């Protein structure tokens, strides 16, 4: 069986550090900070770690329906989504992820845009 990106990068331990780095950037963003005001960052970091792990071949799965339900009433704009993707990419680069891996993760995030953006 081929090794997944999840396994190759060190699993949840590494991905959790990336998620923490992302959430350290959130308060400085003009586009996304307001979506996370009064949020439980501990829980968000855990969920983002699991979600990113799922994209990378880890054991947890998030369906498009799950994503849609989670973000249903957040009214996330395309500009905010784009900012999230850029901050996420920066966080992966901060931990020296390879360009091809970051490109793959970016593509997977962009593929899920319609399940995350807008009001439902």
What is each of the regions a protein language model found here?
Residues 1-120:
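Core of compact, soluble alpha-helical bundle domains
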């Amino acid at each position: 069986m081929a090794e997944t990106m999840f396994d190759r990068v060190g699993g949840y331990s590494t991905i959790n550090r990336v998620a923490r780095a992302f959430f350290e950037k959130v308060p400085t963003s003009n586009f996304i900070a307001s979506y996370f005001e009064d949020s439980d960052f501990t829980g968000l970091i855990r969920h983002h770690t699991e979600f990113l792990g799922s994209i990378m071949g880890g054991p947890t799965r998030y369906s498009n329906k799950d994503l849609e339900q989670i973000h249903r009433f957040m009214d996330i704009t395309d500009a905010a989504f784009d900012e999230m993707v850029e901050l996420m990419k920066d966080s992966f680069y901060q931990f020296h992820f390879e360009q091809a891996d970051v490109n793959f993760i970016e593509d997977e995030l962009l593929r899920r845009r319609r399940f995350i953006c807008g009001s439902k």
